[in-house]
Amino acid sequence: MDEAFLERVERDATEFARGAGALLLEHFRRPLDVQYKSADRRDPVTEADKKAEAFLRDSISASYPDHGIVGEEDENTEHETPEFAWVLDPLDGTTNFLNGLPVFASSIGVLRRGVPVAAALFIPGIEPGGGSVYHARLNGGAFQDDRRLAVTDNPQPERGRLTGFPSFWLRMYAFNGGLRQRLGEVRSLGSIAFEMAMTSRGSFQMCMFTTPKIWDVAGGALLVNEAGGKVLTRTRRNGAWHPLEGFRPDAPTLDNLREWRGAVVAGNEALTAHVGQRVRQRSFAWFRFRRWLRQKVGLNQDATGAPLSNTAGAGNTEHPPTSSNGTGLTQRETRS
């Protein structure tokens, strides 16, 4: 692959992510129209998501008309099997965004035949209007703006360090070899892309996700790898872990990419291997049974009769297993 072309892709992805981040910040902590993808109000979409994705799609299509696009909010582009595909999550962490918490990301991952080759993630700053772009290209290192990034170097989890796990981790996972007591300070921040960025800079020693979707991790996976780390995945519940080097066989279609699912653990190489050997995921059947039982006895409703959120989810963000009625956006409100 032409190195100059790859540098251009990274540079453009960085500017596109910065532009999407600026759009998000224009809507942050302001009244927003909110729609929900499911009847239980667990998967919100805002006008900010849609405007950011439209900006990214327009920018990519203008600069790379022969590249494909896979986005969370809209359909794939018409390119069926493009050499390059841009995988977009315009706003990962929508619930945080809606509640005024600056813990979200706008994520871009660029794939060549399914292999990540460039990434750019906008991460907001604590101060209003601030933010950085975390970016990388294959074999080019990872950076926060101009500062080089590096994962932690501890070969095993350490107490006092931060670890990203899903909010339901105590129920979803079983641990061997005393790992549960040595995971460190567990956090679930509500944005997979944000947690992977924090892992790439060493603020998190590692992070783990149950079944994220491709747009959750396409950018962050390359970021962690280029920061000296390792990202492992497995597609069967307790199958063998292997390095996440690509998201499908050679020349995947955009539909292939959209359908990708897999557990992910990210951190330095020794740490991910250590954790991967000592963690086992429990069956989702138990959680489905518990949900059914709670519904039968009325424990899945609050005092008003409204359904409570299910926490047995698929990742650290707004993607738990759902019971969507298949009708798309079913609820609407304005959040001030």
Please give the residue ranges for each predicted region.
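DPxDG-like acidic metal-binding loop motif
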Residues: 80-139, 143
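N-terminal, positively charged, Ser/Thr/Ala/Gly-biased leader segments
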Residues: 1-40
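Residue-level signal for inorganic ion chemistry
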Residues: 24, 49, 60, 94, ...
